[in-house]
């Protein structure tokens, strides 16, 4: 069957059911207890060496036995037979001096399996059987030395592996294989050689078969033998585009589960697993019975991990039979829709997504850029050269660039030697490698040494399209990303226009002709030196910065890199000024979208730390702001050079040692100076009442400064790494004193609290924690966005008595269900508490409680927490408490099952026919006075205070009543007054001391409605759609009203009316988390919660203020509006500002569209979690509608037809749609 046809057929099968791979071939052969004569058969009776153990030879010497084993597995229910060729490569066959038989063995093995499979397909045509031609790992490793005394030595080369695998692949295809299975991969470089061979043979034969890949996690470390994590391994081989990616061998199902689970999450293709029958016992035998193994498989299948399942060592046809029984009828894993990202790896993964921070590529392992490194390589001092690479990684390099291009070096040999040595150093090889050379043969030699997914630096069009395409195809086959220089046959691009022209041409060739993934294309638009004295060079930096923005906008998913030090080449010898130029240049490049840069990771200056006079002079040069900018910088550079060489005393370098100790500590943290940290920390400890105060005070203050600079793009990862190192030294000095002062006492119990993965909200959780602590419970608070794995791991390690989960947004409900299921699966016997704004007793009873056999208690407020915990941990109270709980939940479930919608549901067609009736012909939408994006940075807190709605503030503290009446309430009035005063005192401090920062933005875009959705355009020509905002429509019977949808309030495209829509995002919480943590560390939980509550109020106030400003000034459709704050709270204005996740648009992922439209994260630092919660937590976002008839409404329940329509418009499968629409889907 042709390759394309077989792929289609197998994919159809995989979409419908879980397919079964066969089990252990070696296990079955061992059951025959063959002796030497059996292996020889008749043909090899006179062979000159022992053949016992050569199982692959049996296809020639005992073919009937292999046929019988295949038959047994197909009879048991297997869909896919593996050929008996695990060790049939020439390399593995060399152990028996049988290299010459490799081709014949592969051919005969495939032919035999083909005959058996066809026989069974003929028996049961509705269940076709397939043959997977097996390519095993060989008995050698391409990335590990077999000689402990020479870590750079290899007993097999990439090319030798390619040759061996090519011969086997040709024979397997000729013998009739339907698929190629690269399995039991313990060294990913071997597998990369194998995949290279397979793809080369496909090209040679003009046929492409589906490829299956299966790796081996060797032990509890969760890594392959060559050291890669599961995700790093996946990233390294993802370029093969296999039909399935899986794991097999080494571990039993219990040990392998977490890695199969991880693979099912990250793999864009189908997932396979064929584990061993447990771990071998003391006699090397496997004890896990077919029934027990099937139990594990059933759980994997029901958890949605699997598309293919089979067995490896110790498994038999009976194991496969039992697996077939438990997976029959179970829905196979659905392929996830993952964001487009460049997925690199060393021993560990590096995923570069749209929202990733700047990636630092270490430049010092380059003989052309580092005199020290060049000397070490020339003198063959490779151990010392490795230390240069390690320093780069320790200083924050996430990728290391390696270049050996020097006239007196054998660049190819040096590259191979150094990369092989790097592979033996986990602290270096954990990061991806950038193979850098101007010589193609050196690049190829380097690619043959790296097991992860690296980057080629670089190729270009300078020698024409044909060579460019040839090299790009090979790079893709080697499994690397590529840097493309802006260079063609005319020359290097030196202007903005030329940079765009060349990069666009290269992009189109790579994507359209080569099939290169756009996310793996990294453009280097050429960084040239500025301030050279030549006028034509003055705009080089500006051209690069602007080209970065152009490329990011016009070439989807492509990334930008560059050699940063080039820009300062005119000032070589004056490192101080060079570092200042780098800091300023990077700051502006990063703001415009530059993804990565080749830098000296140990010597990056912080933008804000560049002296103001120097920074201004540098910016004049970089941004070409003055005609005399070069001369001015040269003048000031001389002064800084003299300081650097000691001719002029730099007083500022000495002054800081005379500052107060708190300021000295901050300075050391920001600058990454370790020289004085111990003596300054000791001085601070002597001055403090308690040693812990040194950490909570000056050390945390300094780290907050580092965090702010990093978040603002004025400080890069290497500096943060150095700051963290300084902090660790300070804490290490204090730890003995802190431990000596600790007192331990008895508690009422230990409770773990966590806000679940993807959710950032924790005010309620923090209040619960404080209340419980006041009642002598020990609290372990894991904070926000905590994964299930972390929660359960810590719960076991700390031996807690209760686990409490919190969440505010609706996606958190599914995560809570997941945690409950995992607790049941792992055999926990602890009570589980559920709380948070999005939770309810009904959801707890219907969705969570039934997945966990221990008590699951919905706690609706902090006041209940103590009573609940006391009952659950009391032997006397627990039985009756749990009995009442069970009765209550059963009642809730019965009520839920009988629950009928208050209004009758209607079809989507009927709902759309009853849309809001607006006479668009007689209405002209208002045109904004100031369209586009508006940013409000460090906004004045005093202004926002006038817009605060205080009623929800009191609700946070469980004081119910409307402001201002609550201040006079008979029962809670006095407490409310105290709270109100404390909040305003804190706001005074916030305002005076700048404790919190408020940032916000809004934008107004041309828009039209198209059905239930809204098209947002890039500009007023309305020709290009920037984004589509998807909406839901009410879907219940409305005899006297409309079935509302937000799109009803935007003029339909066909009306010819030019309408607009707005978006906004605001936060009052920048700095809030740090303040709250500081208060907590100081034991001040009251103010920790207070600062969060105040930050939330500021965010809502900012939203109110900004909406008013939009109505009156920016959009300007209500210029004469005069409303009091009470009127604003009552929404007496024209227009609405609905927010994704709330009743009118309850689906959270639409926040992502807003973020992209307005470039929110880069503009004001607000980000979204995996569940689309906003960070910081004290944040608000939404849309602006201006129509006078617009109003708020609730979508409530929708039906399956609308869910299908929404999924189709969003490009989702129904699994994804059900995940996000679940709370509203009837």
Curated annotation (Swiss-Prot):
Zn(2+) binds at residues 249, 312-313. Residues 358-619 form the Pterin-binding domain. Its EC number is 2.1.1.13. S-adenosyl-L-methionine binds at residues 949, 1137, 1192-1193. It catalyses: (6S)-5-methyl-5,6,7,8-tetrahydrofolate + L-homocysteine = (6S)-5,6,7,8-tetrahydrofolate + L-methionine. SUPFAM superfamilies: Cobalamin (vitamin B12)-binding domain, Dihydropteroate synthetase-like, Homocysteine S-methyltransferase, Methionine synthase activation domain-like, Methionine synthase domain. The lineage of its organism: Bacteria, Pseudomonadati, Pseudomonadota, Gammaproteobacteria, Vibrionales. CDD domains: methionine_synthase_B12_BD, MeTr. Residues 652-746 form the B12-binding N-terminal domain. InterPro entries: Cbl-bd_cap, Cobalamin-bd, Cobalamin-bd_sf, Dihydropteroate_synth-like_sf, HCY_dom, HCY_dom_sf, Met_Synthase/Corrinoid, Met_synthase_B12-bd. Catalyzes the transfer of a methyl group from methyl-cobalamin to homocysteine, yielding enzyme-bound cob(I)alamin and methionine. Subsequently, remethylates the cofactor using methyltetrahydrofolate. L-homocysteine is bound via the zinc atom. GO terms for biological process: homocysteine metabolic process; methylation; tetrahydrofolate metabolic process. One of its GO terms (molecular function) is zinc ion binding. Keywords: Amino-acid biosynthesis, Cobalamin, Cobalt, Metal-binding, Methionine biosynthesis, Methyltransferase, Repeat, S-adenosyl-L-methionine, Transferase, Zinc. Its cofactor is methylcob(III)alamin; Zn(2+). Residues 899-1226 form the AdoMet activation domain. Pathway: Amino-acid biosynthesis; L-methionine biosynthesis via de novo pathway; L-methionine from L-homocysteine (MetH route): step 1/1. It comes from Aliivibrio fischeri (Vibrio fischeri). Belongs to the vitamin-B12 dependent methionine synthase family. Transmembrane segments: none annotated. This is Methionine synthase. GO terms for cellular component: cytosol. Binds 1 zinc ion per subunit.
């Amino acid at each position: 069957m042709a390759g394309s046809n077989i792929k289609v057929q197998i994919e159809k099968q995989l979409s419908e059911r879980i397919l079964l791979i066969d089990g252990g071939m070696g296990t079955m052969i061992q059951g025959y207890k063959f002796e030497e004569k059996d292996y020889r058969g008749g043909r090899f009776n006179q062979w000159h060496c022992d053949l016992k153990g050569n199982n692959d030879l049996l296809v020639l010497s005992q073919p009937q036995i292999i046929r019988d084993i295949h038959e047994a597995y197909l009879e048991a229910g297997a869909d896919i037979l593996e050929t008996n060729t695990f060790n049939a490569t020439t390399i593995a066959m060399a152990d028996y001096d049988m290299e010459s038989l490799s081709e014949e063995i592969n051919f005969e093995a495939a032919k035999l399996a083909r005959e058996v499979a066809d026989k069974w397909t003929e028996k049961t045509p509705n269940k076709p059987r397939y043959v997977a031609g097996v390519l095993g790992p060989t008995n050698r490793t391409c990335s590990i030395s077999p000689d402990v005394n020479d870590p750079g030595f290899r007993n097999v080369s990439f090319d030798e592996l390619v040759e061996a695998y090519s011969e086997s692949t040709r024979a397997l295809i000729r013998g009739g294989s339907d698929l190629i299975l690269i399995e039991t991969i313990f060294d990913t470089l071997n597998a990369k050689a194998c995949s290279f061979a397979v793809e080369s043979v496909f090209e040679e034969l003009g046929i492409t078969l589906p490829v299956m890949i299966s790796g081996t996690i060797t032990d509890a470390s969760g890594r392959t033998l060559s050291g890669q994590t599961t995700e790093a391994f996946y990233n390294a081989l993802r370029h093969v585009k296999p039909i399935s990616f899986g794991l097999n061998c080494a571990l039993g199902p219990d040990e392998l589960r977490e890695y199969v689970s991880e693979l099912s999450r990250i793999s864009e293709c189908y997932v396979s697993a064929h584990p061993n029958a447990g771990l071998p016992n003391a006699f090397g035998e496997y004890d896990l019975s077919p029934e027990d193994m099937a139990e594990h498989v059933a759980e994997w299948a029901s958890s949605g991990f699997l598309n293919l399942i089979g067995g490896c060592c110790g498994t038999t046809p009976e194991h496969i039979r039992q697996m077939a029984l438990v997976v029959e009828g179970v829905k196979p894993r659905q392929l996830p829709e993952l964001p487009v990202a460049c997925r690199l790896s060393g021993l560990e993964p590096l995923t570069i997504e749209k929202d990733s921070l700047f990636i630092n590529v270490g430049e010092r392992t380059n003989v052309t850029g580092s005199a020290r490194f060049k000397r070490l390589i020339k003198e063959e001092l490779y151990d010392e050269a490795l230390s240069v690479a390690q320093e780069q990684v320790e200083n924050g390099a996430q990728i290391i660039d390696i270049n050996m291009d020097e006239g007196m070096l054998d660049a190819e040999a040096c590259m191979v030697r150094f990369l092989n040595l790097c592979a033996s150093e986990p602290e270096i090889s954990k990061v991806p490698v950038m193979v850098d050379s101007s010589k193609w043969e050196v690049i190829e030699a380097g690619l043959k040494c790296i097991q992860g997914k690296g980057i080629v630096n670089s190729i270009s069009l300078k020698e024409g399209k044909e060579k460019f395409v040839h090299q790009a195809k090979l790079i893709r086959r080697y499994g690397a990303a590529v840097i493309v220089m802006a260079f063609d046959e005319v020359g290097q691009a030196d202007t903005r226009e030329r940079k765009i022209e060349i990069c666009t041409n290269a992009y189109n060739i790579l994507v359209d002709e080569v099939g290169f993934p756009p996310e793996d294309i990294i453009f280097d638009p050429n960084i040239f030196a500025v301030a050279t004295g030549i006028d034509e060079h003055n705009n080089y930096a500006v051209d690069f910065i602007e080209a970065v923005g152009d490329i990011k906008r016009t070439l989807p998913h492509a990334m930008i890199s560059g050699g940063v030090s080039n820009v300062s080449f005119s000032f070589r010898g004056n490192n101080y000024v060079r570092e200042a130029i780098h800091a300023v240049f990077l700051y502006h490049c990063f703001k415009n979208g530059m993804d990565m840069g080749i830098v000296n990771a140990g010597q990056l200056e912080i933008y804000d730390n560049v002296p103001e006079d120097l920074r201004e002079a540098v910016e004049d040069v970089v941004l070409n702001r003055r005609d005399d900018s070069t001369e001015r910088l040269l003048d000031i550079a001389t002064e800084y050079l003299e300081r650097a060489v000691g001719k002029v005393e730099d007083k500022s370098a000495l002054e800081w040692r005379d500052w107060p100790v708190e300021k000295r500590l901050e300075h050391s943290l920001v600058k990454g100076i370790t020289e004085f940290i111990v003596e300054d920390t000791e001085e601070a400890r002597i001055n403090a009442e308690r040693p812990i105060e040194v950490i909570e005070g000056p050390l945390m203050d300094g780290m907050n400064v580092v965090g702010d600079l990093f978040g603002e793009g004025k400080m890069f990862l290497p500096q943060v790494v150095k700051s963290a190192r300084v902090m660790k030294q300070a804490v290490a000095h204090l730890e003995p004193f802190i431990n000596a002062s600790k007192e331990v006492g008895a508690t009422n119990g230990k409770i773990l609290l966590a806000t679940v993965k993807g959710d950032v909200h924790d005010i309620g959780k923090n209040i619960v924690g404080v209340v419980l602590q006041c009642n002598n419970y020990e609290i372990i608070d894991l904070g926000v966005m905590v994964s299930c794995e972390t929660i359960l791991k810590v719960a076991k390690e700390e031996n807690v008595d209760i686990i409490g989960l919190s969440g505010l947004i609706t996606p958190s409900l599914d995560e809570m269900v997941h945690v409950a299921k995992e607790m049941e699966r792992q055999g926990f016997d602890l009570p589980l508490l559920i709380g948070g704004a999005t939770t309810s007793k009904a959801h707890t009873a219907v969705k969570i409680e039934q997945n966990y056999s221990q008590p699951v208690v919905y706690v609706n407020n902090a006041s209940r927490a103590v009573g609940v915990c006391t009952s659950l941990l009391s032997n006397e109270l627990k039985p009756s408490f749990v009995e009442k709980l069970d009765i209550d939940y059963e009642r809730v479930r019965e009520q839920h099952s009988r629950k009928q919608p208050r209004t009758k549901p209607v079809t989507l067609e009927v709902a759309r026919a009853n849309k809001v009736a607006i006479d668009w012909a007689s209405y002209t939408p208002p045109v904004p006075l100031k369209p586009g994006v508006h940013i409000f940075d460090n906004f004045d807190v005093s202004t926002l205070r006038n817009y605060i709605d205080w009623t929800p503030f009191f609700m946070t503290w469980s004081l119910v009543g409307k402001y201002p009446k609550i201040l006079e309430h008979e029962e809670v009035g006095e407490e409310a007054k105290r709270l109100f005063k404390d909040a305003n005192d804190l706001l005074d401090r916030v305002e005076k001391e700048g404790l919190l920062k408020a940032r916000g933005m809004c934008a107004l875009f041309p828009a039209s409605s198209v059905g239930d959705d809204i098209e947002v355009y890039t500009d007023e020509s309305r020709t290009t759609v920037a984004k589509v905002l998807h909406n839901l429509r009410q879907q219940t019977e409305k005899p006297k009203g409309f079935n509302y949808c937000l799109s009803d309030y935007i003029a339909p495209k066909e009306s010819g009316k030019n309408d607009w829509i707005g978006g906004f995002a605001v936060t009052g919480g920048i700095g809030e988390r740090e303040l709250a943590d500081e208060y907590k560390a100081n034991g001040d939980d009251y103010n920790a919660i207070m600062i969060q509550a105040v930050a939330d109020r500021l965010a809502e106030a900012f939203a109110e203020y900004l909406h008013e400003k939009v109505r009156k000034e920016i959009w300007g459709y209500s210029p004469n509006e005069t409303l009091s704050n009470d009127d604003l709270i009552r929404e007496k204005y024209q227009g609405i500002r609905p927010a994704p996740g709330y009743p009118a648009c309850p689906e959270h992922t639409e926040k992502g569209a807003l973020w992209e439209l307005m470039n929110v994260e880069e503009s004001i630092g607000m980000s979204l979690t995996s569940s689309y919660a906003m960070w910081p937590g004290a944040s608000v976002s939404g849309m602006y509608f201006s129509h006078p008839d617009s109003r708020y409404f609730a979508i409530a329940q929708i039906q399956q037809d609308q869910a299908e329509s929404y999924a189709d418009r969003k490009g989702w499968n129904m699994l994804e749609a059900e995940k996000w629409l679940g709370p509203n889907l009837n």
